[in-house]
UniProtKB/Swiss-Prot annotation:
GO biological process: defense response; defense response to Gram-negative bacterium; defense response to Gram-positive bacterium; hemolysis in another organism
Positions of modified residues (Histidine amide): 25
This protein's GO CC annotations: extracellular region
Coiled-coil stretches: none
InterPro entries documented for this protein: Antimicrobial12
Function, as annotated: Has hemolytic activity against human red blood cells. Seems to disrupt the membranes by adopting an alpha helical conformation. May play a significant role in innate host defense.
Name recorded for this polypeptide: Chrysophsin-1
Originating organism: Pagrus major
Tissue: Gill. Localized in certain epithelial cells lining the surface of secondary lamellae and eosinophilic granule cell-like cells at the base of secondary lamellae.
UniProtKB keywords: Amidation, Antibiotic, Antimicrobial, Cytolysis, Hemolysis, Secreted
Cellular compartment(s): Secreted
Top-level taxon of origin: Eukaryota
Entry similarity comment: Belongs to the pleurocidin family.
Amino acid sequence: FFGWLIKGAIHAGKAIHGLIHRRRH
């Protein structure tokens, strides 16, 4: 469960980072 939580957090972080990068670009 903990590993899944971290994996989910990383995925969410990448998604948010991608959205921010797209908005800036």
